[in-house]
Amino acid sequence: MQGKVSFFNEGIDFRLLNKIKIKLWINEIILRDKQISSNINIIFCDDLYLSELNLSYLNHTTLTDIITFDYTANGIISGDIYISVERVKENAIIFSKAFRDELNRVMIHGVLHLLGNKDKTPKDKVIMRNKEDQCLILFQSLNA
């Protein structure tokens, strides 16, 4: 079952390109993981907003590009994914990636968290990165 994927801005003026393709991609990733989703909200914001969430909810004082709030219950995938567009832009420069490619990686990173993937240990980080890479390849094939 395809869930609803929605995009919002919080305090910034940002326009996501290819919304329909991104929604299809996210739903395909969930389907391939043999899971069911209801609502996934992706909220684009700035560093300040995400830093405040990070401090309030996780008690972290570091900058981050993404925070995922997982509301999954009874096997139905649901959550809010907050993404700092500022942080993604800066990371794209640091990692010599196109902004859109880095943004896609961060979005799918949040979705993978909703699917139960972790990235706390070095081993988990490698597994997560490999899954992100596989998802990005799928995105390219959907856009071919």
Where is each model-derived feature located?
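An acidic/histidine-cluster motif and surrounding catalytic segment
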Residues: 1-104, 114-144
